[in-house]
Amino acid sequence: MLRSTKALAAVSVLLVAAIASDAFLIHAAREYFKTTLAIRLDPAGLGAYAGERGTLPKNESPLVFFGDSRALMWKAPDGPMSYRIVNRGVGNQTTAQMLLRLDADMAELRPSIVVLEGGINDLKAIPEFPERRTQIVADCKANLTQIIEACRRAGARVVVVTVFEIGHVSLWRQPFWSKDVHEAVGEVNSYLRTLTRDGVVLFDANPVLTEGKDEVEPAYQVDYLHLSSAGYDALNRQLLPLLRSLPK
């Protein structure tokens, strides 16, 4: 009788685990499907800030954080600033999508400074399309260059942020991952370092985030792609003096 009870309990646990696993997979699949449909409906992500468009005073030229979810999560630095800070980060966007919406955001906001952060959503596709690695990296570089040039033509100074390194990749993600992503991040960052000129400065995030290691410090990450509040605080301690040093 005791054995039967234990066996029944074990089967029950396995059944509950299987149901929970199925529910998780169904939820994940549905969220992915919704994201895919949203991109098809609005490839540039112009709807992300539709409710805020036209609300900024016309006599202001703000400082704009522009990019993907890493920019979206970047809270404004603490401390006095002479600029209003506006965030125009959109989650999941590639540099191609960022480029698509750039003109609309620049025309609306007329920024004095653009803090540009993007590229990881291009590069994280490499494990799924290894045969396109060279083109993915080249397109990422070209799109970031075009964004920088468009910002400069609009009169904005540009702070180019290096692509954040990757955090710890969990065991269950490793089948969908590749060291090629790390190498591509390094390649794009080496290229970004060549783009500095009058009106374009580099903010190298990785010495702060990795502290000399190969991946982002655990305290600075919420997952392998995204930073914690502590990570952004660490970046802001270095970014704020840089922003204050820029000519007006």
What feature does the model see in each segment?
Residues 131-139, 176-187, 223-227:
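Alpha-helix N-cap and loop-to-helix initiation/capping positions
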Residues 98, 201, 219-248:
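Histidine-centered active-site loop/cap adjacent to the catalytic His
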Residues 168-205:
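Substrate-gating cap/lid alpha-helix
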